[in-house]
Structure formats: C-alpha cells, structure tokens
C-alpha cells in the first residue's frame, strides 16, 4: 500500500519514535529526587508518541477516506492524546506556580473538547486551540521561573519556543514542494521534545550513586 502523504506520515512516525524513546529513557531513570512527579512527564511523552503514531497512520494510509471508521478512530486517538499532553504541561506549570486553579481552568476547555471528539468531531482547529492553551501557560511559566533563577526552566523555555515556532510554521503555511508545513512542524516539535526531556531530567533531579 503506497503512502499517501509521505512527508507528513514519515515525520509523524519519526516524532513517534523520538518521543517513545525519550519516555522509555525517563521511565528507566533511577534515584530521582522527585519520583512521584515522573508520571506527568511520562504522560507528556507517551501521549505525544501515541498521537504521532495515529497521525502517521491516518495521513499515510487513510487520508483519502476521511469518513471511514478507522480514520475517525485515529483522529479520536489524536484528539484525546493532545488533550492529555496539554494537561501534563499545565500540571507542571500549575505545581510550579503553586496555583492549581489553572487545572480547573483547563478542565473547562477539556471537557467539551473531549465530548466533541467522542461525538466524532475532527476539526483540527479545536485540537490546535487546546494545544495552544497549554503552550501559552507553559511559556509564561518558563519565562517566570527562568527569570527567578531556576535554570532548569531554560530547557523548558527553549522547548516551548520551538513548539510555538512549529505552530507558526503551520499557521503561516511555510513549506516546500515535497515537504509541507505539517512535516516541518513535526521536525521542529521533535527538537522541542528533546528540550522537554532535558527539562524533565533537571526538574526531577537525581541523587548521585
């Protein structure tokens, strides 16, 4: 079976592999100073990984059949995982700012978003808006914490800026003939996830052995 949207699908699969490896590496780290907070970062890496896998399959093999059951299931997986990834980032920001009301605010957006996805909605604009909410919260938290002298947040800030740059590429529709905006976004997002991994390691800490 030929790949339909090769640039998008292959870069989605690349992002899937990168985030899966990062999640597994983080899961295996021992002697963490904050072991109870590891789950929220694992949630980020594994949900991005799963949504990328679903996206690669959808774009690569079912983009010509958007009304098919398989395509709808794949998009449901993407939507739900984007929601959980946004939750994970907002959770870290809220805990850092000691303001868990941010999670309540997020839930106001997430509940109708999940209901929309479960009812078969597949307008990616809603998905992008949810992701943007998490990025904005995380961006301002990163700037605030870094300016306070928390150097671990430099990696978080760079990861957030990379992801926002990727979003701009998609919105402005910057791309090449055989390598479109979505493919470029996936590559930039992969770089952003590497920065998030660096941040996660510093945030969780590790006792010397």
Residue ranges and their predicted role:
Residues 53:
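Conserved phosphate-interacting/catalytic interface
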Residues 1-47, 56-209:
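Polytopic alpha-helical membrane-helix bundles and their juxtamembrane interface segments
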């Amino acid at each position: 079976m030929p790949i339909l949207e090769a640039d998008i699908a292959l870069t989605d699969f690349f992002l899937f592999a990168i985030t899966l490896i990062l999640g597994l590496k983080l899961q295996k780290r021992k002697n963490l100073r904050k072991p109870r907070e590891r789950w929220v970062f694992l949630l980020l890496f594994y949900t991005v990984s799963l949504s990328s896998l679903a996206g690669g399959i959808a774009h690569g093999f079912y983009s010509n059949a958007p009304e098919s059951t398989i395509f709808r299931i794949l998009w449901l997986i993407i939507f739900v995982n984007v929601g959980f990834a946004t939750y994970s980032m907002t959770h870290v920001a809220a805990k850092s700012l000691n303001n868990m009301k941010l999670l309540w605010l997020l839930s106001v957006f997430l509940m109708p978003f999940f209901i929309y996805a479960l009812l078969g909605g597949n307008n990616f604009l809603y998905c992008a808006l949810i992701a943007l909410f998490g990025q904005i919260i995380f961006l301002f938290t990163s700037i605030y914490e870094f300016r306070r002298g928390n150097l671990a947040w430099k990696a978080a800030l760079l990861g957030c800026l990379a992801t926002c740059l990727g979003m701009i590429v998609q919105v402005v529709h910057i791309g090449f003939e055989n390598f479109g905006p979505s493919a470029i976004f996936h590559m930039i997002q992969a770089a952003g996830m590497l920065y998030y991994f660096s941040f996660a390691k510093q945030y969780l800490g590790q006792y010397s052995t």
